[in-house]
Amino acid sequence: MSHKGHPYSASGAFFLDNPIRRLIQPPSELIEKLAINPNDVAVDFGCGPGYYTIELAKKAKRAVAVDLSSEMLKKAQNKAEKAGVMNIQFLQSNGTNIQLEDSSVDIILLVTVYHEVGESEAVLKEFNRILKPESKLIIVEVIKKGIFHGAPVQNPEALKAEIESGNCKLEQMLPQKNTGIFFFTKKT
């Protein structure tokens, strides 16, 4: 599976969080499918301007917004403050060294981000470190061409094989418009 390793520029944050996207792809629609427990710690990896972070935080005990870009994190933090959502921790990381305790996370969510991860093997190892046993890694990627996604189309079988090599098992894949929601569980 090819990875660009080029994160989305903060100058394009408007395209990640705008009224048209909210009509077509409301963040609450995806978050409802995740079955988040009120005691969960949920990570929004590659959070960008916080499009999904706020909804995660509303469902979970605590949300952790992780992004490589300090500019994106500032946008997400400003958005959280305006929304009055205070249970979010903001961390800058490329994913190879996330400043969280071992086995402290219930859910890691990546929405059209995994294809941008440069060091996927190291990132999967880090996810494995911070995930609790039998917790969830949820990856949303484009699996067929559509008019609203600029992200490259991913091969579902290649994605499954790569993630499963990182100590996770695919439990379910839900097609949603032109994306696939891949639910992985950390192996014990």
Regions inferred by a protein language model and the residue ranges of each:
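N-terminal, positively charged/glycine-rich alpha-helical extensions of SAM-dependent methyltransferases
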Residues: M1-G12
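Conserved SAM-binding loop and adjacent beta-strand
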Residues: S11-I31, A151-V153
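Class I SAM-dependent methyltransferase SAM/SAH-binding core
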Residues: V43-F45, P49-N97
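A short acidic, Gly/Pro-enriched loop at the edge of an enzyme's catalytic core
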Residues: T96-I107
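A short SAM/SAH-binding and catalytic strip from SAM-dependent methyltransferases
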Residues: D106-E119
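A short glycine-rich, Lys/Arg-flanked "PGG" loop and its adjoining helix->strand segment in the class I
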Residues: E121-P133
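Conserved beta-strand signature within the Rossmann-like core of class I S-adenosyl-L-methionine
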Residues: E134-E141
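Core SAM-dependent methyltransferase catalytic element
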Residues: P175-T188
